[in-house]
Amino acid sequence: MGHNLVAVQSLQRSLLTPTIGFIRKRHVQPGQRLTTMNARAETVGQLRTYKSAWAKSQLYLVPMLRFFEPNWEQPTHVRWSIGMATGEPFAVASLYREWEEENGKKSFSFTQLTISADDHPFMNRFHRPDEEKRSLVIIPSSDYDEWLGCKNPERARTYLQPYPAELMAGQPAPKVAAPMQNELF
């Protein structure tokens, strides 16, 4: 099942179900490893993978209740669930790409935009101690229409800001092992 995205098409919001990862796996050359789940805001307009979509302002929002990041404040990492302090849904800035499939139908894929979180009072707690800290870009709900309708890449860049730490919350959320098949308890 894909993720729902919100986009503006013909001056109306549309809900699509694209796949995560900007380059669909079937379009990656055998033996090539290409990770496109996230795109760095600092280079999204320069990298060949994203340059065209960024120039065309193919901007989307990915609605979420939470996302997960590894916290390394202990000797071994602990998965954390991160969301709004209010528990309300929010949306993350993303970039989409349209594909024409062999059957002639259109499909969509997306990448989430990230920014440095080295100086963020909350998001700097995540990822390995020796790695750069990154965060998804949360777009305030008051800016949804402006983000989705933005047709100027430099103006779009002004939305790629750290979200206020005091409006965010997180807690440990270790993965629960799935029960083995054919077991009742």
Regions found by a protein language model. Give the residues of each.
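Short, His- and charge-rich active-site/binding loops that engage polyanionic ligands
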Residues: 1-59, 83, 104-105
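Extended alpha-helical targeting/anchoring segments
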Residues: 48-56, 69-95
